[in-house]
């Protein structure tokens, strides 16, 4: 499985990590810089905390941050 780690940057996931994710949230600079974004591989879909959005998927490079487009 390959997942995006950032804009147009994809990497093969380590063994046992079969889920891609995109985690977004706002911090103090959200109004000027936009959402904070973490992308990557995981063994299971991370648990979202209040104010954090997480999207998970399980096909190659499926963890697209929609505001960037496909990244391809």
From Swiss-Prot:
Q: Subcellular localization, per the record?
A: Secreted
Which Pfam family, any one of them, does this sequence belong to? Toxin_cobra-type
Asked whether the UniProt record includes Ribosomal protein among its keywords, one would answer no
Q: Which residues carry this modification: Arginine amide?
A: 72
The keyword Thylakoid is annotated on this UniProt entry: no
One GO CC annotation: extracellular region
Q: Which PROSITE patterns match?
A: SNAKE_TOXIN (PS00272)
Q: Which InterPro entries match?
A: Snake_3FTx (IPR003571), Snake_toxin-like_sf (IPR045860), Snake_toxin_con_site (IPR018354), Toxin_cobra-type (IPR054131)
> Which molecular function term from Gene Ontology is one that the record holds?
ion channel regulator activity
Main localization category = secreted
- Disulfide bond sites: 3-20, 13-41, 26-30, 45-56, 57-62
In which tissues or organs does this protein occur? Answer: Expressed by the venom gland.
List the keywords (alphabetical). Acetylcholine receptor inhibiting toxin, Amidation, Disulfide bond, Ion channel impairing toxin, Neurotoxin, Postsynaptic neurotoxin, Secreted, Toxin
What does the UniProt function comment say about this protein? Answer: Binds with high affinity to muscular (alpha-1/CHRNA1) and neuronal (alpha-7/CHRNA7) nicotinic acetylcholine receptor (nAChR) and inhibits acetylcholine from binding to the receptor, thereby impairing neuromuscular and neuronal transmission.
Q: To which protein family does this belong? A: Belongs to the three-finger toxin family. Long-chain subfamily. Type II alpha-neurotoxin sub-subfamily.
| Protein name in UniProt | Alpha-elapitoxin-Ast2b
